[in-house]
Amino acid sequence: MTVLNARERKDQKAHQTKELRNQGHVPGVLYGKKVKSTPVSVEAVAFLKTFRDVGQNGLFDLQLENGGKHHVMVQEVQIDPLNNQYMHVDFFEVDMNEERDVNVPVHLEGDAPGAKEGGIVNHLLYEITVHCLPADIPESITVDISNLNIGDSLSVSDIRANVPVTIVNEDDETVVTVTPPTVTEDPDATEEDNTTAESVEATGERNDDNLDRPGRVE
């Protein structure tokens, strides 16, 4: 199992945390049902490599300087939106014998025939919640859309049998649809139709005026 080294943080003051980030480390916290909440820090480069290698719900060992090793997964990551710097990481110690709920990303696979006919593929459910042991958590759930025509859709009930773990979501939740292409009106044609209608209306008004005008008596 992948190992990420960490050290305990004794000083949690704001200026110390900022200095820690400036030195290339990410502050975080280790917690779980059987471990006391412990402030920690990890090297930013090492964390990024580990996170990319194991994936969103991947398991790895967090090795503390004092010799303690914990089976963990990343529960939450806080990122600065301005510079994409990792601000804080939550490491959750998992019990390998206890099932838990986890959100797993949904990926679409294949080319929908309906899309080739001009239809629009709408990916509606980007994550699915599964309930399973930590070792059985899938990295992602792949949904095949190669048989979807215009007007077709796939819901959770359609993919449940193909997923080897328990899906928590309701059966009627829609994962993906293929809808007919949107027809946009030609603004020039619309303007021309409006102009024609106005001309006809104006002509009608003139004719009405002529009918109302009294004729000349000889």
Curated annotation (Swiss-Prot):
Coiled coil: none
Annotated SUPFAM superfamilies: Ribosomal protein L25-like
Bias type Basic and acidic residues, positions: 203-218
Keyword terms: Ribonucleoprotein, Ribosomal protein, RNA-binding, rRNA-binding
Transmembrane residue ranges: none
Superkingdom, taxonomy of origin: Bacteria
GO biological process, one term: translation
Chain residue ranges for the region called Disordered: 178-218
Pfam families: Ribosomal_L25p, Ribosomal_TL5_C
Function text: This is one of the proteins that binds to the 5S RNA in the ribosome where it forms part of the central protuberance.
PANTHER family to which the protein is assigned, alphabetical: RIBOSOMAL PROTEIN L25/GLN-TRNA SYNTHETASE, ANTI-CODON-BINDING DOMAIN-CONTAINING PROTEIN, RIBOSOMAL PROTEIN L25_GLN-TRNA SYNTHETASE, ANTI-CODON-BINDING DOMAIN-CONTAINING PROTEIN
Family (UniProt): Belongs to the bacterial ribosomal protein bL25 family. CTC subfamily.
UniProt name for this protein: Large ribosomal subunit protein bL25
Species this chain originates from: Shouchella clausii (strain KSM-K16) (Alkalihalobacillus clausii)
